[in-house]
């Protein structure tokens, strides 16, 4: 399988199974529209006749021979070596957990998938005992795995920060007895951050996610406080302070959401960069199409163009010798990550689960509140192994649309929650998400290919 596209004045060709990327000329691009394996010894006469209106016949024949040579060398149309790994996609030890430390929030974001923080379950905070049981559950279910991840999530975790501190202390106390090493992450809207919280986060948290949508008018349209006022002016000083004090060996990024109201989101990325934030993630809102802020199919041409604009802006910054990292343009063309991760992505419901303040267990934070996906409870000791096994097998070869898609090894089958919520089944591709993901991948592939081309010259 191959995928080719035009972008930024270049023609790109991706060999899907090997991950090889090539910059090709117009003749090769057009010829590949007309030939595919199994190849004849010579270029078919009807193809030569068709393309000779635009290209020299000898050039067409030479180009065909080169394509066949690359095919014989397993560089183009390479065989799928990944499907065999799908047989290894069995239920795995749990190694990561999203801990819903607070089902409450001090913001009322209009697009919030979590019903403004309580996930439709009533506002509550996780107590220490529930959090402790969750840590014990993770240790018990992790098998021989040493590195465990805990994401403190909400709602807004800073509303229950004392419990966060106690649970970090408890988890650390369990590392040596169980030969484990915890890595903590916290996601915060920044409104309630104090200097003491910042110091604790920068000491204990392996990663921190800072939620902001970009320009003041964009952020404050959707990310409002309980009284309806904006949050931008309150959070910017807090985020700047946290990032300035953060150790260089620890991760962080600002994470935004764009909606129909700011389809010029490249300006929000650049605004965040100009504020001093060079680790940036901005994602499309996922919402019911009836919502006024929802992104629909009609918005895709504008969104695609905006990603192209963003890639040009980022490339300009890098050409000036400066650093910026946009998470959705990060791509590994060197056969990484591991095969199983390429096939089933984040591991929700299998290697990763979420725990609510009352001890309920779900496949991930976006499934919380969907009764049919409740996997168990920490207090009654239940856990649905059959559901865990179902998620373990929810890889790209068991998703009909994904199996034949060129992007499958990069999106890994997409978000299971979005697939269920918007396409009716975790095995069904959510087409809107897919199309946006493919465009981001094309931009990322082209940026990487052009960089390699420049390095070779």
Regions found by a protein language model. Give the residues of each.
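Radical SAM enzyme [4Fe-4S]-AdoMet core and its adjacent flexible, acidic
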Residues: 217, 221-233, 240, 244-348
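Conserved alpha-helical substructure of the radical SAM core
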Residues: 55, 61-199, 203-204
